[in-house]
């Protein structure tokens, strides 16, 4: 028969911090991380009171896992308390409520100390959304609604904490010394990716630099830490209580950069893990950049795209959109984009996390000029990255609807458009004119001036070469068939 554990606490252990160099982080781009640390435990048989104070301010207490990595010791946490409030002047006034403490005040340039009894600390709120109440202090038998000076607090007892900490009651049947691993999730830390793409004036080869930025607002610093970045849309519930950084905790933001390169990504279920090859030190409220990608000689292509319709026409449920005014309003701007294939043959070939791409052009004088940016989605290996960087200055487009006719008896509708593309540049260009065919599900192009490509169920694309100074006209007619009879014809 298994013997019952002794329930009397035999020892109180204070773990001030984890083992140096044994901390690791798995940071997700959804404002949370898994924090892992190694703590030295010296437990006696029975129930031990243990205090671990090296905890993130926005830790998720219910996520705590304390274990023996070797699997030899079964650590049983019978009870856990988390003290996570940041200590402020109001907090300490509340601790000494009902007691008399000293206050330092200045009168006519001279300092002196006066005693005052804390009747009310001011930490209590009259309602959840209301600001704290004013403190009430008794000085010389008189009550006042403000502090008489700077409070000078007495020495704190051992049960008071100024840093977030876990208090555990850990049961073990026999005495044991071990290096235990603690793991828990914490909010207020995240990472995001940025890409700098450098193009040359006379070449389609580009340089791609990828950076990961860590933003740490957990209330905890990490020294010499192993870091993994997890990319993907992971289902994670938000904190039950909104985690807000207290105003008292705000300090000057520290921004540092590193130059380590890591382009190895490993699969984790349906996500990807990027492991940084070197250890990182990350202070609280620090933002740090580390380089994870550097690719030279990436073959790219500048493209011009004209999506003329200012608003899309879409079917609604089982009903066709036969509104005569739908899809008529058009744009005159031709967008500029860069595209390249994310393949090993093109010096890339790694899963690229979503991030902002900034494009720079190296001019003839070798100086870099900013030419646009784009929020790129996550891109799997071998897929094409297409990033829109702005609008072409010397390319102009017009889009005009030339016909719209509905035949209720035949359940059909026809619609015709003409697109004009003008090139004011000194060199020839090719413009991709994309048109959305969205009034109804069944359609066909009954007439066209140029060949087109059907991109999907509702999109066609014309690749139109335009020489310098030329205006090209592209026209087409779409025939919608099998229109539902219940649609009201305008």
Model-predicted segments: where are they?
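Long, intrinsically disordered, low-complexity accessory segments associated with secretion
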Residues: 2-4, 10-490
């Amino acid at each position: 028969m298994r013997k019952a554990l002794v329930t009397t606490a035999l020892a109180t252990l204070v773990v001030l911090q984890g083992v140096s160099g044994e901390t690791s982080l798995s940071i997700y781009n959804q404002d949370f991380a898994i924090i892992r640390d190694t703590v030295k435990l010296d437990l006696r048989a029975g129930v031990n009171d243990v205090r671990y104070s090296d905890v993130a301010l926005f830790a998720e207490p219910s996520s705590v896992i304390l274990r023996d990595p070797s699997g030899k010791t079964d650590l049983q946490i019978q009870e856990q308390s988390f003290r996570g409030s940041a200590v402020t002047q109001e907090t300490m006034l509340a601790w000494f409520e009902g007691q008399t403490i000293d206050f330092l005040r200045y009168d006519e340039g001279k300092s002196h100390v006066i005693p005052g009894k804390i009747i009310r600390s001011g930490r209590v709120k009259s309602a959840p959304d209301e600001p704290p109440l004013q403190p009430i202090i008794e000085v010389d038998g008189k009550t006042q609604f403000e502090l008489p000076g700077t409070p000078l607090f007495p020495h704190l007892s051992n049960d008071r904490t100024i840093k977030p900490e876990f208090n555990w009651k850990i049961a073990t049947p026999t005495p044991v010394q071990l290096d235990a691993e603690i793991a828990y999730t914490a909010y207020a830390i995240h990472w995001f990716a940025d890409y700098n793409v450098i193009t040359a004036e006379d070449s389609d080869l580009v340089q791609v630099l990828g950076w990961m930025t860590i933003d740490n607002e957990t209330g905890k610093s990490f020294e010499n830490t192993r870091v993994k970045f997890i990319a993907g849309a992971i289902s994670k519930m938000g904190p039950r209580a909104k985690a807000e950084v207290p105003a008292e905790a705000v300090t000057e933001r520290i921004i540092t950069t590193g130059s380590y390169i890591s382009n190895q990504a490993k699969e984790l279920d349906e996500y990807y893990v990027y492991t940084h090859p070197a250890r990182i030190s990350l202070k609280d409220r620090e933002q740090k950049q580390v380089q994870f990608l550097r690719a030279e000689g990436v073959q790219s292509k500048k493209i011009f795209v004209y999506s003329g319709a200012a608003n899309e026409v879409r079917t609604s449920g089982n009903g066709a959109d036969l509104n005569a005014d739908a899809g008529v309003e058009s744009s005159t701007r031709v967008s500029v984009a860069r595209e390249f294939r994310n393949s090993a043959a093109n010096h890339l070939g790694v899963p690229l996390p979503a991030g902002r791409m900034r494009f720079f052009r190296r001019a003839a004088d070798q100086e870099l000029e900013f030419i646009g940016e784009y929020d790129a989605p996550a891109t799997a290996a071998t897929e094409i990255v297409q990033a829109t960087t702005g609008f072409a200055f010397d390319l102009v487009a017009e889009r005009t609807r030339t016909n719209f006719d509905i035949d209720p008896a035949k359940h059909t509708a026809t619609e015709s458009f003409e697109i004009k593309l003008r090139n004011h540049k000194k060199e020839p260009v090719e413009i991709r004119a994309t048109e959305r065919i969205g009034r109804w599900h069944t359609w066909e192009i009954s007439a066209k001036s140029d060949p087109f490509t059907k991109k999907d169920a509702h999109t066609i694309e014309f690749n139109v070469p335009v020489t310098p100074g030329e205006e090209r006209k592209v026209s087409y007619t779409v025939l919608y068939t099998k229109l539902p009879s219940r649609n009201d014809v305008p």
